[in-house]
Amino acid sequence: MGDIKADTLLPTIKHLFEPIPKGPSPKATLAVEPEQRGERRFLLKREAQVPFVMLGFRVPNYSSDDSYALDILESILSHGKSSRLYQSLVYDQKNSLAVGAEYSLMQTDPSLFYFYALVNPGAKVDTVEDALYREITRLQNEPPTELELQRAKNQVEASHVFEQDSNFRHAMLLGQAESIGAGWRRVDQFLERIRAVTAKDIQRVAKQYLTADNRTVGILIPQPPKAAEPQPTAAHAGKP
């Protein structure tokens, strides 16, 4: 990337690296995570001001065509203050200070589709968790509107384009695609795949992956700060 000429650069690269003998290729050992067969839950008690709820659902990476529908699904749920989660939990129900979802298809291995919510003081953790489940069920029962779908596609497309607003960022994106095994051509195919996603695709992946048996739930329970340990007074600071 940058102001370089291939006809002058390639001979230099060959001169420097071609004499180096090729070593044996390392044997790839990839562990496959077993299928999750039921919900997992954990509570974490730490010093904090408000509770925090997180849901994680196992989903595929770039190697599955479903990854593009999941990318659009994330945008519908949590991109901006007009998103479904923000409108429902923050504006309407007022039980969360912040809420959203996260997913990245550019991963070496299958990944997670996250939901998170920062619980409003005075609201119950169970209420917020149930509200997240209702939004998931809503998507499973009703596909997004054409307006929602097109807005999400526009957001994902704009983010992808602006991510490559410099040669450095473009090179980093191509390098990431190569390093995880996706191949650099997948970067050029991304927008075409995103534009092909339909509302029925969104509903289908929500039904397939956002299920109770496929989720892990983590909840942060706030604890009061520990009392400060008393400091020695000046009279006791010296040696006896």
Sequence positions of predicted segments:
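Charge-rich, well-structured scaffold segments of protease-associated domains
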Residues: 1-25, 43, 53, 92-240
